[in-house]
Amino acid sequence: MAITKEELLDYIGGLSVLELSELVKAFEEKFGVSAAPTVVAGAGAGVAAAAVEEKTEFDVILLDGGEKKINVIKVVRELTGLGLKEAKDAVEKTPTTIKEGANKDDAAAMKAKLEEAGAKVEIK
């Protein structure tokens, strides 16, 4: 008569910690396997590789509209396509995110244009 999986699980569930330890050792010897976790080392290497990866998306944040707000409003409208009122609100209610997820070159170009108009800008 064969033992079902359910019966086997019930039996193993009733074992003490010492008996379970002996069972694991017996499995290791009989089948030539190890119960030591191997995934832990691999996970650490993956995290290190992700940390080295270069950032590809940047946010352009307007910190201050400066003294020449009209010029900054014009540039904000040009870069974002916002209407006059929305662009004015963005310049007056700083800090404001002007662009999210821009690539490195676009973010740098936007920053240069806004700074040329008199704004203080940050790229994150």
From Swiss-Prot:
Provide the family line.
Belongs to the bacterial ribosomal protein bL12 family.
| Biological role | Forms part of the ribosomal stalk which helps the ribosome interact with GTP-bound translation factors. Is thus essential for accurate translation.
Gene Ontology biological process terms, A to Z: translation
Gene Ontology cellular-component terms for this entry are: cytosolic large ribosomal subunit
Mind telling me which residue stretches traverse the membrane in this protein? none
The protein's organism comes out as Wolinella succinogenes (strain ATCC 29543 / DSM 1740 / CCUG 13145 / JCM 31913 / LMG 7466 / NCTC 11488 / FDC 602W)
Q: What keywords does the record list, in alphabetical order?
A: Ribonucleoprotein, Ribosomal protein
Q: By its UniProt entry, which CDD domains does this protein fall under? A: Ribosomal_L7_L12
Task: Extract one GO molecular function annotation from the record.
Answer: mRNA binding
Q: Which SUPFAM superfamilies match?
A: ClpS-like, Ribosomal protein L7/12, oligomerisation (N-terminal) domain
Q: Subunit arrangement?
A: Homodimer. Part of the ribosomal stalk of the 50S ribosomal subunit. Forms a multimeric L10(L12)X complex, where L10 forms an elongated spine to which 2 to 4 L12 dimers bind in a sequential fashion. Binds GTP-bound translation factors.
* Name listed for the protein in its UniProt record: Large ribosomal subunit protein bL12
**For this UniProt entry, which residues form the secretion signal?**
none
